[in-house]
Amino acid sequence: MENEIITVACPTCGSAVIWGEQSPYRPFCSKRCQLIDLGEWANEEKRIASDATHSDSEEWSEVDDR
């Protein structure tokens, strides 16, 4: 089973991608798909779901001026 070829779907376009050294952008099929995904995260079109009911800023503490 060492030589088993693992194939995954590109998260952006769905193309088949071989999971190995020959696919430098894995799990993406290309640099283009990788950058599209990065842009979606940067524009907050994608986010990690949370059950938090408060703002993250509520947990921030003031900087201690020593």
From Swiss-Prot:
Outline the subunit composition: Interacts with GyrB.
Query: Cofactor: bound how, per the entry note?
Result: Binds 1 zinc ion.
Cofactor dependence is on:
Zn(2+)
Spell out the PANTHER family in the cross-references.
DNA GYRASE INHIBITOR YACG (PTHR36150:SF1)
Q: Organism source for this protein?
A: Edwardsiella ictaluri (strain 93-146)
Keywords, A to Z, come to: Metal-binding, Zinc
One GO MF term on file is: DNA topoisomerase type II (double strand cut, ATP-hydrolyzing) inhibitor activity
Gene that codes for this?
Answer: yacG
- Supply the source organism's classification: Bacteria, Pseudomonadati, Pseudomonadota, Gammaproteobacteria, Enterobacterales
Q: What does this protein do?
A: Inhibits all the catalytic activities of DNA gyrase by preventing its interaction with DNA. Acts by binding directly to the C-terminal domain of GyrB, which probably disrupts DNA binding by the gyrase.
User: What is the top-level taxon of the source organism?
Assistant: Bacteria
- One GO biological process from the UniProt record? regulation of DNA-templated transcription
**Where does the chain bind Zn(2+)?**
C10, C13, C29, C33
Q: What is this protein called?
A: DNA gyrase inhibitor YacG
Record SUPFAM superfamilies? Glucocorticoid receptor-like (DNA-binding domain)
The family annotation for this protein states: Belongs to the DNA gyrase inhibitor YacG family.
